[in-house]
Amino acid sequence: MFQARPAPVSDFEQLFVAPADESVPVAPSRWIALTDLQHFDADPQWSRDGKMVYFTSNRDGYTCLWALRLDSVTKRSAGQPFAVQHFHGTPRAHTLYPTFSVGPDRIVISLDQLQSDLWMMHLPEGH
């Protein structure tokens, strides 16, 4: 799984998965797009069970944490991305690039604010 800017004139990036092949680089024609090229989607991480991808996106005007359910067989998106955690409002609105780590039942998020913050949120059932 990776992020890329497939259109050289685009300001946005999108998320892809590709079959693993250690012998040769995987041709872009074999990349499977998970998100569209309408937003800046970045920092993808698998959920522990492989059924979900968590990522940061500016799709609501702020850089927030989003998720996307995947088809367990094809690894294609199985629906629309949905917000997991918003970072709107002062001072969180000034967060540019949160970093995060996905655990079995929680996500730990590091925010770049005037003073560094470390957040931990429990994932609801089904996440």
PLM segments and residue spans:
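Blade-level signature of beta-propeller repeat domains, shared across WD40, Kelch, NHL, RCC1
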Residues: 94-127
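A flexible loop/linker signature enriched in serine peptidases of the S9 family
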Residues: 1-25, 35-41, 56-67, 72, ...
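Conserved blade-ending motifs and adjacent loop-strand segments that build the rim/top face
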Residues: 32-43, 76-100
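A generic structural signal for ordered secondary structure
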Residues: 16-17, 31, 47, 65-67, ...
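Beta-strand initiation motifs
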Residues: 22-32, 73-82, 126-127
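Short coil/turn segments that connect the beta-strands within blades of beta-propeller domains
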Residues: 49-51, 105
